[in-house]
């Protein structure tokens, strides 16, 4: 769920998901359309696509189990929400791997009017 995703981002990327990724670019936050603006925004695009493939679990509300070892996330269990955990894990790692190009000044609260192109397919 979103709270678990927030905690996962904190563990892996050492940033607050809410304060760093909830309104970034065209895809980080609610909804999304257009072309991802940078590598971080692409992390969110891929995360949205991943959520779109999940069945049997509400990604924003469903709980999953995971543990953290040496900064890595291990998704546990075999329930339907394990897929959500794997989506969240991949996004948190993607955020961490792209911290060097994260551009808050340009893409934080990026206007939706700049995201009007047709979305590329997942």
From Swiss-Prot:
Q: Is Hydrolase included in the keywords of this UniProt record?
A: yes
- Chief location of this protein within or outside the cell: secreted
GO cellular component terms, A-Z: extracellular region
| Cofactor binding description | Binds 1 Ca(2+) ion per subunit.
Annotated active site: 47, 88
> Which E.C. number(s) belong to this protein?
3.1.1.4
Q: Which reaction does it catalyse?
A: a 1,2-diacyl-sn-glycero-3-phosphocholine + H2O = a 1-acyl-sn-glycero-3-phosphocholine + a fatty acid + H(+)
List each coiled-coil range.
Answer: none
Needed co-factor(s): Ca(2+)
One Gene Ontology term of the biological-process aspect is: arachidonate secretion
Task: Name the source's superkingdom.
Answer: Eukaryota
Name the cystine pairs: 26-115, 28-44, 43-94, 49-122, 50-87, 57-81, 75-85
The answer on whether this UniProt entry bears the keyword Disulfide bond reads yes
Give the UniProt family note: Belongs to the phospholipase A2 family. Group II subfamily. D49 sub-subfamily.
**Subunit record text:** Homodimer.
Name of the protein described by the UniProt record = Acidic phospholipase A2 1
Q: Which organism is it from?
A: Protobothrops mucrosquamatus
